[in-house]
Design a protein with these regions (language model features):
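Helix-hairpin-helix
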Residues: 1-9
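Alpha-helical scaffold segments in soluble metabolic enzymes
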Residues: 5, 36, 116
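The DNA-recognition helices of helix-turn-helix-type DNA-binding domains
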Residues: 9-13, 102
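Long, charged amphipathic helices and adjacent flexible linkers at domain junctions
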Residues: 13-37
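Histidine/lysine/aspartate-rich catalytic loop segments that bind and position anionic ligands
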Residues: 34-88, 92
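Active-site-proximal loop/helix of nucleotide/amide-processing enzymes and allied scaffolds
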Residues: 67, 71-148
Length: 148
Protein backbone atom coordinates (compact mmCIF):
# COMPACT_ATOMS: atom_id res chain seq x y z
CA UNK A 1 0.00 0.00 0.00
CA UNK A 2 2.83 2.39 0.89
CA UNK A 3 4.57 1.67 -2.42
CA UNK A 4 1.35 2.48 -4.28
CA UNK A 5 1.09 5.82 -2.47
CA UNK A 6 4.68 6.69 -3.35
CA UNK A 7 4.13 5.76 -7.01
CA UNK A 8 0.93 7.83 -7.06
CA UNK A 9 2.73 10.82 -5.53
CA UNK A 10 5.53 10.58 -8.10
CA UNK A 11 3.01 10.37 -10.94
CA UNK A 12 1.10 13.36 -9.56
CA UNK A 13 4.33 15.37 -9.43
CA UNK A 14 5.17 14.39 -13.01
CA UNK A 15 1.71 15.42 -14.21
CA UNK A 16 1.82 18.73 -12.35
CA UNK A 17 5.20 19.47 -13.89
CA UNK A 18 3.89 18.74 -17.39
CA UNK A 19 0.76 20.83 -16.68
CA UNK A 20 3.07 23.84 -16.52
CA UNK A 21 3.63 23.36 -20.26
CA UNK A 22 -0.03 23.91 -20.98
CA UNK A 23 -0.38 27.03 -18.83
CA UNK A 24 1.35 29.64 -21.00
CA UNK A 25 4.94 28.68 -20.25
CA UNK A 26 7.39 30.97 -22.08
CA UNK A 27 10.39 29.44 -23.86
CA UNK A 28 13.40 31.72 -23.48
CA UNK A 29 16.17 29.16 -24.02
CA UNK A 30 16.78 25.59 -25.17
CA UNK A 31 16.94 24.49 -21.52
CA UNK A 32 13.39 25.84 -20.97
CA UNK A 33 12.14 23.59 -23.79
CA UNK A 34 14.16 20.62 -22.55
CA UNK A 35 12.71 21.07 -19.06
CA UNK A 36 9.20 20.63 -20.48
CA UNK A 37 9.89 17.23 -22.05
CA UNK A 38 12.93 15.75 -20.26
CA UNK A 39 11.22 13.75 -17.53
CA UNK A 40 8.66 12.29 -19.90
CA UNK A 41 11.13 11.43 -22.67
CA UNK A 42 14.42 10.44 -21.01
CA UNK A 43 13.44 6.85 -20.14
CA UNK A 44 11.41 5.94 -23.23
CA UNK A 45 12.52 2.68 -24.85
CA UNK A 46 11.59 3.80 -28.36
CA UNK A 47 12.31 7.03 -30.19
CA UNK A 48 9.46 9.51 -29.88
CA UNK A 49 9.14 12.88 -31.60
CA UNK A 50 7.26 15.68 -29.84
CA UNK A 51 6.24 19.04 -31.22
CA UNK A 52 6.19 22.15 -29.03
CA UNK A 53 4.00 24.79 -30.65
CA UNK A 54 4.55 28.44 -29.72
CA UNK A 55 2.72 31.71 -30.24
CA UNK A 56 4.35 34.95 -31.42
CA UNK A 57 5.71 35.62 -27.89
CA UNK A 58 7.22 32.11 -27.54
CA UNK A 59 4.48 31.03 -25.14
CA UNK A 60 3.61 27.34 -25.35
CA UNK A 61 0.31 26.75 -27.13
CA UNK A 62 0.48 22.97 -27.05
CA UNK A 63 2.79 19.95 -26.96
CA UNK A 64 1.89 17.04 -29.21
CA UNK A 65 3.30 13.56 -29.84
CA UNK A 66 3.98 13.30 -33.57
CA UNK A 67 5.54 9.87 -34.00
CA UNK A 68 6.78 6.82 -32.13
CA UNK A 69 9.60 4.91 -33.77
CA UNK A 70 11.80 1.93 -33.01
CA UNK A 71 14.82 1.54 -30.77
CA UNK A 72 16.94 3.80 -32.92
CA UNK A 73 14.75 5.67 -35.38
CA UNK A 74 11.62 7.77 -35.55
CA UNK A 75 10.01 8.08 -38.95
CA UNK A 76 8.49 11.52 -39.47
CA UNK A 77 7.53 13.60 -42.48
CA UNK A 78 7.52 17.41 -42.29
CA UNK A 79 3.84 17.49 -43.29
CA UNK A 80 2.88 15.62 -40.08
CA UNK A 81 4.57 18.35 -38.07
CA UNK A 82 3.22 21.33 -39.99
CA UNK A 83 -0.36 20.04 -40.16
CA UNK A 84 -0.43 20.21 -36.34
CA UNK A 85 1.37 23.56 -36.23
CA UNK A 86 -1.05 25.10 -38.73
CA UNK A 87 -4.10 23.73 -36.88
CA UNK A 88 -2.81 25.34 -33.66
CA UNK A 89 -2.00 28.67 -35.40
CA UNK A 90 1.62 28.38 -34.27
CA UNK A 91 4.05 31.20 -34.99
CA UNK A 92 7.03 28.89 -34.44
CA UNK A 93 7.85 25.36 -33.34
CA UNK A 94 10.45 23.31 -31.50
CA UNK A 95 10.81 19.62 -32.23
CA UNK A 96 12.17 17.21 -29.63
CA UNK A 97 13.02 13.56 -29.90
CA UNK A 98 14.76 11.15 -27.60
CA UNK A 99 17.60 8.70 -28.06
CA UNK A 100 16.79 5.57 -26.00
CA UNK A 101 20.55 4.89 -25.69
CA UNK A 102 20.77 7.95 -23.42
CA UNK A 103 23.35 9.61 -25.71
CA UNK A 104 21.84 12.80 -27.17
CA UNK A 105 24.43 13.20 -29.95
CA UNK A 106 22.59 13.97 -33.21
CA UNK A 107 22.83 11.37 -35.97
CA UNK A 108 23.24 12.13 -39.67
CA UNK A 109 19.55 11.19 -40.09
CA UNK A 110 18.63 13.71 -37.35
CA UNK A 111 20.49 16.45 -39.22
CA UNK A 112 18.89 15.55 -42.57
CA UNK A 113 15.32 15.53 -41.26
CA UNK A 114 15.95 18.80 -39.40
CA UNK A 115 17.03 20.47 -42.65
CA UNK A 116 13.88 19.21 -44.40
CA UNK A 117 11.61 20.39 -41.57
CA UNK A 118 13.34 23.79 -41.54
CA UNK A 119 12.88 24.17 -45.33
CA UNK A 120 9.20 23.22 -45.08
CA UNK A 121 8.76 25.78 -42.30
CA UNK A 122 10.10 28.54 -44.51
CA UNK A 123 7.51 27.66 -47.16
CA UNK A 124 4.54 27.69 -44.75
CA UNK A 125 5.81 30.62 -42.66
CA UNK A 126 6.28 28.76 -39.35
CA UNK A 127 9.86 28.91 -38.06
CA UNK A 128 11.60 25.86 -36.64
CA UNK A 129 13.46 27.59 -33.81
CA UNK A 130 15.18 24.49 -32.38
CA UNK A 131 15.48 20.72 -32.49
CA UNK A 132 16.34 19.07 -29.19
CA UNK A 133 17.71 15.55 -28.88
CA UNK A 134 16.90 14.24 -25.41
CA UNK A 135 19.19 11.76 -23.66
CA UNK A 136 19.31 10.50 -20.10
CA UNK A 137 19.24 13.77 -18.14
CA UNK A 138 21.01 15.71 -20.89
CA UNK A 139 20.13 17.17 -24.27
CA UNK A 140 21.65 18.63 -27.41
CA UNK A 141 20.18 21.77 -28.97
CA UNK A 142 20.67 22.14 -32.72
CA UNK A 143 20.40 25.91 -32.24
CA UNK A 144 23.17 26.01 -29.61
CA UNK A 145 25.41 23.77 -31.76
CA UNK A 146 24.91 25.98 -34.83
CA UNK A 147 23.22 23.13 -36.74
CA UNK A 148 20.01 25.05 -37.44
Amino acid sequence: AKASQIKAAIELGRRLKSYKAQSSFCIKSPSDAAELVMEEMRYLRKECLKLIMLNIKNMVISIKDISMGSLNSSIVHPREIYVEAIKASSASIIICHNHPSGDPSPSEEDMNITRRICEAGKIVGIDLIDHLVIGDGKFVSFKEKGLL
